[in-house]
């Protein structure tokens, strides 16, 4: 059972100062998928982001990295989804995940925002529909909820970054499985992966 995913979104903050911060892990997925498919992402002001398009397994997949700030991501997602008549359940959103360690990434369908401002705004702008797919890229947790804001806007130490990068690479490899064979097979493969 394949999934008709038509849009992959990588949540991020715009600008060079945020490019390597943990909160931008979702964007790294989109950038890596574009690189693997030799596609350039270009600025599209009407979608408030950078976009591209790839074809994989005979399916067109639009790529989007919002260039709004994280807490306004939904404006970008909704603009592109509405223009191309893409339903929430045809969207996969890649985002950083505090509740998973670096080196781990997991696919999920539906659910709440878990305190993630990018997901919160996207759910709100999609009419409170939470049925989109998610790719949760583990970044770890600082251990104290009061330190989360600085943690996500900070850069990971080299070893942690290598683990995050390895999980992003594996997630990109699993995208083909997700699109061709469905969520369960993609989860089975990705969820058994852990970079050390």
UniProtKB/Swiss-Prot annotation:
UniProt KW Amino-acid biosynthesis keyword: no
Reactions performed catalytically: an N-acyl-L-alpha-aminoacyl-tRNA + H2O = an N-acyl-L-amino acid + a tRNA + H(+)
Cellular compartment(s): Cytoplasm
PROSITE patterns, per database record: PEPT_TRNA_HYDROL_2
UniProt site (Stabilizes the basic form of H active site to accept a proton): 96
Binding, tRNA: 18, 69, 71, 117
Keywords: Cytoplasm, Hydrolase, RNA-binding, tRNA-binding
Annotated site, Discriminates between blocked and unblocked aminoacyl-tRNA, chain positions: 13
Chief localization: cytoplasm
UniProt enzyme class: hydrolase
EC number: 3.1.1.29
Active site: 23 (proton acceptor)
Purpose of the protein: Hydrolyzes ribosome-free peptidyl-tRNAs (with 1 or more amino acids incorporated), which drop off the ribosome during protein synthesis, or as a result of ribosome stalling.
Oligomer status and interactors: Monomer.
NCBIfam families per record: pth (TIGR00447)
Recorded family membership: Belongs to the PTH family.
Protein's name according to its UniProt entry: Peptidyl-tRNA hydrolase
Organism of this sequence: Photobacterium profundum (strain SS9)
Gene name in the database record: pth
